[in-house]
């Protein structure tokens, strides 16, 4: 009955330590909302504007001569919801006998800043961009995750022969992750129709992750007792059983009779059970993890823009940024468990930002109305992530974008657009500690030209996510359903001198 106790011990450590990927918004989900112009119309890949310092840097060369400065502020609110089914949840004190439980994480990013600047002179455009192309906030699961509770529930289930009938626990997980991007580059206007761009982006990543299981209780015939006391009582019971068997073996040996195989097997089983219980003693007071990570990476960016008639075409390629996050962690010793070693103190972990290809087209239908189209591809499988998790994907991420702008007056422009995001996910890749799901997004907003030198901007962007359902086993049913929500509000100001 207790031969799998070591697996439970491994699962406890693995589940807790793997939480460090929860709040990561980089990975295969790269932030592209780097300006208010994107919020109000995400199809900016061939648009001519200051926000092009990020989305279409070659096209910035076609802006008027002078200094251009854009300042953007965004507020983002996300929820991440996992509905988990597991028969061991029915043993939970707070679950009312239900095998299904909802775990919700709330992620708030109250301030996502970005700055775009360009100085155009003659055929040259010198550009700078500061943004948060990955992460951007913190995510908190106040009740932990299903992978946390399933571990405790499985332990309670395995301890039933020793009198356990249920469990209680408190779980908690929080992750905070930011990738700050600093981009410098130059565009050159080859002709009135063609421009090219080359630049570098430096990414500085910083993250903090906390995971906790506390107040673990075991239900018995006498009521709930703390996990440590239960283990001590169980160990006392096992010691008594082992002593009785040893006494029986001694009697056989004293009589010169062979010891029955059943007796030695019972002793081996009880001793193995005791050893497994001893391995769980370290969790009698719960589990705490604290891990800080940081790293720096640099990658080149190239772009091109071509105009003809009422059309503008553009493309941009961002090379892969190699990121090796260095840990400062409460995990100090090496372990046979890979998930533990991922967060070992002073270890460096691969967390590359994948390469990206963006292409776009803009059509000036009239002098006042513009139609925008775009396509993004992220080369996720060519990135290097810890334990080669990129190999669990079926392919890279694809995004399809469309939008329209209308100059109602010389001062007021309104716009709207949509973005369709498709990941190539697999059940093996998905888990409740780090997940994305397919989605479509809608954005709208306006520009108001307050003067010849000042333009005010506002936009709203909402993402609607699908559900991803994963069934681990059918008998008994162990499954998860993943989904999210995302809403972003932003304001900005653009100055031209």
Task: Kindly give the residue locations of the regions a language model identified.
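Hydrophobic alpha-helical membrane context
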Residues: 18-19, 68, 195, 469
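Short stretches within intrinsically disordered, low-complexity N-terminal or propeptide regions
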Residues: 15-22, 92-94, 189, 305, ...
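Outer-membrane beta-barrel porins/channels
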Residues: 26-39, 43, 47-48, 112, ...
